[in-house]
Amino acid sequence: MHVLGIDIGSLEYHTHLLDAADPTRSGGAIDAFANSPKGHHRLAAWLEKHGARAESTLVVLEATGVYWQGCAHHLHRLGFAVSVVNPAQIKFYAKSTLRRGKTDRMDAEVIAQYGATMRPKPWKPAEQALEAIQFLVREREAVVALLTQEKGRLHALRHRHEADEVVVRLVEERISLLEGQLEALERALKGRFAASASLQRDLELLTSVPGFGFVAAATVLAETNGFATLESGRQLAAYAGLSPAPRQSGTSGGYARISKVGNPRLRRIAYMAAVGATRSRSGLRAFYLGLKQRGKPSKVALVALARKLLCVGLAVVKSGRPYDPGYTRPAEAAPASP
């Protein structure tokens, strides 16, 4: 078996091919390729030249911005097992080996050795419709951030002594433009869901859960690839960075916070959904109030509710049954401090 480590850059990527059967894992073939369709084809030919067949080669690369996507999709289409790992995992692995120095070639070797040692799970590309939805959801998030910023500026300008009318008008026009873009993005999102019966079904199931509106449900489905690779609430909570991270050393008292090692967009939208769920007349609100009655701070209770909401959302989508309040037990779950 071979393991290919790829250090991704915006213009090119460096590769290191290891024979996983070699216990020393030293040596190996190295090269560099343009991060372009032509470069991806050259990489495939290079792998064939070195006897690295698709059925017996694991490709490992870091999730570096969007630059990894072209190479990963190309190799996946050719039948290679591709693992896309968090750069932090590679960084900590490199530290554990007391690696000195840092170059692109050295990074590719570290990634290959990580793959040979850890054997990370293969990556599964999102279906095309979900990729488009994720792109729209993230663009909407960016527009909302700009809109919030411009509304704040307009508020300040209107309270300023003798604000310039030209500046005020320009800010008002920008706000109007951004509001129009927001409406266009939401129409496009609804159109994407309407075009896919399975995604529309999942959306309706998720919005049956108190706290999940259209945008929150769309974000959760986009950021989890429709729950395709998640089998349990524990996995989902960890992926969102909402799982407990205990801290205890020697005689120091132990305490727990959420790990925050995960998808920040998913964590943020789950928290916002939890805030909405506290205003509903449901068992989820009762769950939150029960934690408050037990002395938990509001934020701790909200984090616990956010985690529970994701777990309930996963359950309704996997089961194909809408939310049933009878399955919510206010007494369950022990929250972790945020």
Named regions from a protein language model:
Residues 1-338:
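A detector of single, family-specific signature residues
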